[in-house]
Amino acid sequence: MKAVIFAYHDMGCQGVQAVLDAGYEIAAIFTHADNPAENTFFGSVSRLAAGLGIPVYAPDNVNHPIWVDRIAELAPDIIFSFYYRNLLSEEILHLAPAGAFNLHGSLLPAYRGRAPLNWVLVNGESETGVTLHRMVKRADAGEIVASQRVAIAQDDVALTLHHKLCQAARQLLNSILPTMKCGDIPSVPQRESDATYYGRRRPEDGLIDWHKPVSTVHNLVRAVAAPWPGAFSYNGSQKFTIWSSRICPDAQGVLPGSVISVSPLRVACADGALEIITGQAGDGITVQGSQLAQTLGLVAGARLNRPPATSGKRRIRVLILGVNGFIGNHLTERLLNEENYEVYGMDIGSNAISRFLLHPRFHFVEGDISIHSEWIEYHVKKCDVVLPLVAIATPIEYTRNPLRVFELDFEENLRIIRYCVKYRKRVVFPSTSEVYGMCTDASFDEDKSNLIVGPVNKPRWIYSVSKQLLDRVIWAYGEKEGLRFTLFRPFNWMGPRLDSLNAARIGSSRAITQLILNLVEGTPIKLIDGGQQKRCFTDIRDGIEALFRIIVNEGDRCDGKIINIGNPDNEASIQELATLLLDSFDKHPLRCHFPPFAGFQVVESRSYYGKGYQDVAHRKPSIDNARRCLGWEPSIAMRDTVEETLDFFLRSVDVAERAS
């Protein structure tokens, strides 16, 4: 059986040798050129291949049509990937009749993605393993062929676990490859509900937070110990790296980051003390803990710190277009609560963000994105993360002004996306739950659910398809030109400053604002088509916390992902929302200032929205991606959200207006 192999690192060497030992013919090996900036402590696949007389290549882009054609000419029966760092295109995966198979360093479906070796140690796992699985378009998601478990000892560090995994991989391959060569290839589907995803790790991820539990800090030290970059902290402006440590008994009443003793060198964490066994000051040599304390000038009672402001690390610059909107102003507040963010914003008004205008890390320009293109391009280039939040997003406008919806929601935002591509900036783009349209799934899955819309003569769908098309364009830019992106899909976020009662007066507001206006003015609450449409209402605080975590993007887990942000537990019909709102209104201390309740009125959607409208019976999100990528769960009950939203709007009504 003829094989083409994609391989790198020690695992790549083990895989190549195992394939040869199993009697396969290797037509060619594809690998990577070593990066001079990387500590190449591992074996060289290219040297191994050259020594064996096997053709070896290291193309910059193996998925280029030229290389796809060359691989096709090799006519492989089977393809193997052993720690090759790039995803293979579907064109390559389909070239081998027997299939393409990848060796992954975890027990799938757990720890899909990058650096599973390090992540299992960071998370304090007691077991991991290696898995050979069939390759499909989604990384690490194909059917499992075979796996082998590896116990993680308490004294294991990254390098010792790496050696264990290499040994386990060789045993696994020696066992399964002869069977596969005979055409017997087991296939067990992965359980998606058990899948977890992790992104790549960077050297800066080794920064120690002494306010974490001591086991967490110790596990970080284990996970990135040499030859990885190491866990580090600061004494003043002096950086030092901890190469080995142990957990000590509780350090009661000691502030985290405080030096408890210098011989041995022990530092307080949230619930105990970390003893530093070996470490290194700056670029110096590795020494034992007490000598490190002497080198750093530490004494008992000294406080270790995070990197000083003068260390040269600048704040993350976030550009928010539509900063005065509902999401924009709440997100600005969340970002400014963190010291390491600076916010640049543009909008056509500033009423919702007036509380930030004098903030030293908030920079606002009043303007229109369709006019001020030069300002926008300059600030896309200047900033690190871009959020184009400007959109017409109220249903009545879809039928009133479909062309304006398309021009703003698609054309203007496409220009911004192209700036992000041009300057290689990360974009966090607001898709919408509307893209699912009339999907019939019980809950809408970002990666599986079909996006179903109505006929062309229903302009109500112009918003949905504009957003969906932009989602697809962004995805294509990510695939073809390396755009870093995350698409997030809000599901009926509610809260203070959602919009305004004036917007509701002209019919251009969200549902709850329109209902509140009816209560304030003593007009009947209109239930469109009886108000039986179900939605999952999400508190703005829950939504913004998820969005903030997307911006933080720990471990790059959100790159290239679509993430629903909604609360499946808060599902209610519009009629149920109106009833809950009325109950809260009757109990509110300002109730006496407003007219009597005028009752409910059932109206047809055609008479309210126009002939181009078409409604959706339900809209419920799957939030598995949010759980995996963000570690996020919504927690705020719908009643709490309704009461807070109502209170905000009632207190915004002028006293004179109440009396009238």
Swiss-Prot record:
Catalytic residues (UniProt): 104, 434, 619
Assigned keywords, A-Z: Antibiotic resistance, Lipid A biosynthesis, Lipid biosynthesis, Lipid metabolism, Lipopolysaccharide biosynthesis, Multifunctional enzyme, NAD, Oxidoreductase, Transferase
Residue segments, region Formyltransferase ArnAFT: 1-304
Binding site for (6R)-10-formyltetrahydrofolate: 114, 136-140
Location of the region described as Dehydrogenase ArnADH in the Swiss-Prot/TrEMBL record: 314-660
Assembly, per entry: Homohexamer, formed by a dimer of trimers.
This protein's name: Bifunctional polymyxin resistance protein ArnA
Lineage: Bacteria, Pseudomonadati, Pseudomonadota, Gammaproteobacteria, Enterobacterales
Gene this protein is translated from: arnA
